């Protein structure tokens, strides 16, 4: 086994020979990261990515300046989907070490699950992985129900069934109930709804290769809310929360749904399909109907929903939408506390009417006359939230996955958003 490379932190600038803007230097003892107080966590994460790029796969975080957040920043940059890495962690107090261990267990689960090939992770596998993770941290405080295939159609989950019926792998709805009170009549505090499209070809509105090659990650919203619930439980969540994952493949076959099809939902809404690649909102609608029926204080849905959100924010921020200004402010405050990037985008009443159809109440995609695609997608979802003006947050997960490495991240999933949602649930 190779000897670990020591990584230490310093608030002193690097020797001038390393350059005026050097953020790290090397000596006989190892590598020194030079913190300047401006963005220390970002500096540590970027340095970790560089250290990994040097081929250094065994490190020891050394010295007294490391805390849980700094250790975590290092790991976020150091972790990558290929190869193995070993970190010898510094001595931390019990609370910080427990926090770090929980992040490593749960957020790494989120990243690894999103990175899994679609051949390995179908709708049923995603639902079962979610059950296993939550059960691991919640024990007997959790119950769940899995509904799949024709049972979905018979029970009226027409959006999820319609999207998923084109695949040989049956669509699946996971309904999970975390109830720490033990009282079956206890009110539900929050519902989390996740888009779990385990591969998205676009259907008959087929994607080009350049847009399809990362679509194993189209279940990023489901993984994120699952991780958020698990992480909130490790932080002492003592309120009842229900999780709904809407899992399916969106593929082409003789049984796949087609443009012009009309879906009738359990709340009476009829939706004309004019783009089979706008499938995420069709499956989320079923989950949001179930969530609304619980009468919770809070509904949060998360989905890799639109390219428009990525166009606006890149992969650097998650997009946040809500009619509830106070609740949006609470989410953004949680994001600030957890050092995770969220940005609120517009959502107004008029966005709800920008999905006209000649044959149904709603179209599943906006026309060229209404180009605000991320906002109209959120407007579409609002039609399936009973009290959409209060207590509902929609997260378009544009920061979930990176197709190529950048200075802070390897290629693949980031795990961003888990801590923010967990923070809000436990605030």
Swiss-Prot record:
Mn(2+) 1 binds at residues 200, 277, 279. Keywords: Aminopeptidase, Cytoplasm, Hydrolase, Manganese, Metal-binding, Protease. The active site is at 207, 281. It comes from the Bacteria. The keyword Hydrolase applies. PROSITE patterns: CYTOSOL_AP. Its EC number is 3.4.11.23. One of its GO terms (cellular component) is cytoplasm. PANTHER family: LEUCINE AMINOPEPTIDASE-RELATED (PTHR11963), PEPTIDASE B (PTHR11963:SF20). This is Peptidase B. It comes from Shigella dysenteriae serotype 1 (strain Sd197). The lineage of its organism: Bacteria, Pseudomonadati, Pseudomonadota, Gammaproteobacteria, Enterobacterales.
